[in-house]
Amino acid sequence: MNFDVAVVGSGLAGLTVALHLADHRRVVVISKRTLPEGASDWAQGGIAAVLDSNDSHDEHVDDTLIAGAGLCDEAATRYIVENGRAAIEWLIGHGVPFTRDARAELGFHLTREGGHRHRRIIHAADATGHAVVTTLVDKVRAHPNITLLEDHFAIDLVTDAKLGLPGMRCHGLYVLDCKRGDVKTIIASQTVLATGGAGKVYLYTTNPDTATGDGIAMAWRAGCRVANMEFIQFHPTCLYHPFAKSFLISEAVRGEGGKLVLPDGTRFMPAHDERAELAPRDIVARAIDFEMKKRGLDCVYLDISHQSPAFIQEHFPTILARCLELGIDITRQPIPVVPAAHYTCGGVVTDQLGRTDIAGLYAVGETAYTGLHGANRLASNSLLECMVIGRGAAQDILGQPATAPTPTPIPAWDESRVTDADEEVVVSHNWDELRRMMWNYVGIVRTNKRLERAQHRIALLREEIAEYYANFRVSHDLLELRNLVEAASLIVDSALSRHESRGLHFSRDYPQTLPKALPTVMQPAHRRTSRKH
């Protein structure tokens, strides 16, 4: 299958790239599930941009740099912030139903979130991601130049190195048709990775099941640098229930007087921070983690039951309804909660146009490391980054020839030496073991001893998975596990190499912050030459 551009991933970043290209290029969008599926669709908050005359680019940049704890790239941050309004206007032009406010300058309601000094978050009620993605998916489905491959899983990139040629260029990729079970070869002049983050590497995550670090792992295997993978943002309060994966309990519950308590009803936050339940997100997450590990607890509890049922119904109707479905009446009893992996701040190293170290290969959205998020992401900057870098990547692609010559015929996928898997239990066991180990050893609070144990076990898991991959036909679950163990390895190696505590990385062995902030850049051992930006 031949296309001008292959876009891997169907969240906001991937859809933005595809729609900016489609009038001038033949585009294929590859999604491993049916659309819409991905973290963008789940995003509740909104999109940060300077949309009011009382606000300024300088202040938005400054807020971002403060949150990033010294590791933001200031030039990249300024570029993204300054292009924010144009990105929002593009969405409005496509008909995204943002919440309106007749009194606002632009006519839309702006809210304020932690770390922002002004109201600058444009939103669609409390389901912004869904509103944006649903609108764009309809446009993608209707465009004659876009081919949509749903239930297709990108396996690996086809590069010069894979073809045994000198140079560093990407020529497309191999893709598994998950329904038919066969592997397709997709040839493309440019390939864009927009597969999201790696939250599923942890036992508890707010991310959808698709967040298995696919793009990061593919780019790393192909020879791209990866940066700052130790910085994983954790949300402090995710509902703890076997039938409720990834359901967030909003920080507003604590804002309206909710108290964090142990199983016996004792509050613990005042002992950790004078701001108690209103301390910043990372401090609350660390405190909960400390109490759980110290006491061997599966969860702690968030109690809002002292407020009236009418108050709870008015302020938290969704949380009340979801908990009631699961047999938890939050007007009478506390909510079981755990911290959960929320956002991957690191990723594939790119420039401001999404270009990676390999010619013809781009990375956008949570897959990429542009330098915007540094050591900690500022709320609602992630969807902004998806759109601005996505549009920049599309413009860069449009400035190049539509069809690049393929140097040699790309061979079909070779299944001559593999058989059907007869031990699927190996995949499911390793999947469970990896995620539990990452949660216990590489979580919110880290120690060298735990990290070294994780590193040792990951090395063994990688060997087992590589052997399995070499001997059996690829499957959806096997490919996800292969990518997850790669992402886990990058997180652990990055964490071990940082001898300080900064932003989201907190080490008991190195509690101090060093005077100089330096990014952690991992370089593949097999890389031959580097393309400089």
Swiss-Prot record:
It is an enzyme of class 1 (oxidoreductase). Pfam families: FAD_binding_2 (PF00890), Succ_DH_flav_C (PF02910). It catalyses: L-aspartate + O2 = iminosuccinate + H2O2. This is L-aspartate oxidase 1. It is found in: Cytoplasm. Pathway: Cofactor biosynthesis; NAD(+) biosynthesis; iminoaspartate from L-aspartate (oxidase route): step 1/1. InterPro entries: FAD-dep_OxRdtase_2_FAD-bd, FAD/NAD-bd_sf, Fum_R/Succ_DH_flav-like_C_sf, Fum_Rdtase/Succ_DH_flav-like_C, NadB, Succ_DH/fumarate_Rdtase_cat_sf. One of its GO terms (cellular component) is cytoplasm. Its cofactor is FAD. Binds 1 FAD per subunit. Its EC number is 1.4.3.16. The active site is at R281 (proton donor/acceptor). The record marks E113 as: Important in orienting the L-aspartate substrate. FAD binds at residues 10-13, 32, 39-46, 214, 366, 382-383.
